[in-house]
Amino acid sequence: MKKRLTVLCAALALALAACGGTAGESAPPAASATPSPAVLPVTVKYGISNSWDALMPYNSVSGSNYARMVYDKIYDRLVYVHADGTLSPRAAKSWESADGGYAIVFHLDERSAFHDGTPVTAEHWARTFFLMTDPACPTLGRGNFAGLVGTDEDGCRLEGEPFGAEAADPYTFKLTFQDPVVPEDFLLEKNREFYVLPTHRLEGVDPAEIMEQALWLDPIGSGPCKFVSELPGSQIQLAANPKYPLGAPGFDYLVITVMDKANLLTALIAGDLDYYAIGGSVSAEDADVARSHGLEVLPGAVPNTFYELMLNNETLPDARLRRAVELALDKELLCLQSSQGLGQVTGSYVVPTSVYAPQEKTAAIRDTEEAEALLAKAGYDGRTFTLACTSSRAGLAALMQQNLAEAGIRVEIETVDSATLFAGMSDGIYDMAIASHTPNALPLWFVESRFTEGNNLFHVADLSPYQALISAVRTERDQPARQALVEELDNLLAQERPFIPLWFSTALHVQSPTVTGIDYPSASFSNENVWDWVKR
């Protein structure tokens, strides 16, 4: 058949030539008798429950993790942060401490390039920091730059002073700080805030007008995906960057669609989505639904939520009273009710998987007799305390109320929204409150911001013992010495109990039925390894 077709094509060509073609003219190529089927592009359908509010990463009003998930694809960051707090190269292939701990030197990947083909250099990074700290530039989140040499407490660059972001050579980016820093701590805390901008396209632009540039409607980054199009607040289409240094994503397009959170799992089951943010997280109840439809559900490798009982140290002024509250609580029962078997009770704020986790400390076991004895020593007069909670934790609060009553501590519950809860604790309106937070591996992740004059959230009368230890931990660069200081701080907290650590819980992640290579737990750091994703 193939031979016959060849002969027919040759005969047709001769016939056409005989119909008067002039010398030097060439006949058009013969059309294929059976055209190849078009190869359809491979598209990953990605669901997200909240929209991004800007495509310029330093102009996000919300500063939300949902916006960061979009920036993470278009723009590049210095490193990739894993769920356990370890770091992998991204724009920086290596880094080290310098100048006695006052600086960090980043060695950039020479293969990095913006989507317009321009190589990314240290000058782009330095210029990004220079522009974003200009007092005239309406940078949102500028406080993240505070602490660099040559900036004030708001992160604004000070005119006439040396600035702590410089290009030491074309591929060496150096940051210099006002106080000593540990590179890994800095990156764990700040990596998701910093992106390199195509500053070669901002030459001559007035800093006051940077956020108004048309560039941010059709942004150019150096990340693993390229911007294609956007329906603001609804959908964004990205194309894989085949030249991304860490590898080309195993798809052609990534389409991120905003939909109601309640519909994400349903859409995944129906095949309308391949994956959803953040990390395919699912409740224990919905995990059963996912499994019943043949989807695999796996627990995360590290805790993703920390629960605490906030205490007002002004209305609970005696440490013995605060420790009595802890001993009255049945943490195991409370944890089981809240996390449905995915929690671990704790006596510390330090994440149990962190290298700084206390090795021998265990959570206080419930002891109502000891609680009653401490109450007597503290002179508790039977007053009623207010316990604030959100509506989703009303059942948990009721169980706590029962626990405390069994030890003789009176509590009344006030159900409020989250903003009112934190404002009420800050203003000293409530005596206790149930709260949760997203932890990380930093040794000061929870305490550093809560024991300051400006944010004395627990109304501690004397902050100096805490501040002295926090400062010592922050500036100590020797690992064993630092670990000893963290333990000393943790022991002080256990003795004084300005707040009560309750438990850490782990998330469940629905695995994509169509995409492999997803690092689900690390999405909690607002980064996703899309260069490893392959749609099958």
Segments the model singles out, each with a brief description of its role:
Residues 323, 335, 412-421, 446-513, ...:
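Extracytoplasmic/peripheral linker and loop segments enriched in polar/acidic and small residues
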Residues 340-377:
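Structural transition elements
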